[in-house]
Amino acid sequence: MRHRHGYRKLGRTSTHRAALLKNLTIAIIKAGKIETTLPKAKELRGYVERLITRARKGDFNAHRAVFASLQDKEATNKLVTEIAPKFADRNGGYTRIIKTRIRRGDAAEMAFIEFVA
């Protein structure tokens, strides 16, 4: 039974999963839109939205908290100074997932994940 199981394991160890989500987050911040598998996109959505909510405050502590999660100065600065202010009047729902195709090699469902505004 999977009662009250709060996240997808994505077939990885906990540290590998954390690194994967961090790298996908940096990629979406830098590019604005990425294509990945549907389960990864669904798991990434919550991770990114929590970071944006934290970055919306825009103060020094928010900047530090975002950097602690990402460990990437360029992505942190872009998130806090460019992306988060766009969502100042929006309470959640900062990203959208669009199903795109079935990947030919392994029949995995693929999806785009992008920022809404």
From Swiss-Prot:
Subunit structure of this chain's protein: Part of the 50S ribosomal subunit. Contacts protein L32.
Pfam families given in the database record: Ribosomal_L17 (PF01196)
Gene Ontology CC terms: cytosolic large ribosomal subunit
GO biological process, one term: translation
GO terms, molecular function: structural constituent of ribosome
Family named by the database record: Belongs to the bacterial ribosomal protein bL17 family.
HAMAP family for the chain: Ribosomal_bL17
Keyword Transferase: no
Alphabetical list of PROSITE patterns matching this protein: RIBOSOMAL_L17 (PS01167)
Keywords: Ribonucleoprotein, Ribosomal protein
Gene3D superfamilies (alphabetical): Ribosomal protein L17 (3.90.1030.10)
Name this polypeptide is given: Large ribosomal subunit protein bL17
Keyword Ribosomal protein appears in the UniProt entry: yes
Annotated organism of origin: Campylobacter lari (strain RM2100 / D67 / ATCC BAA-1060)
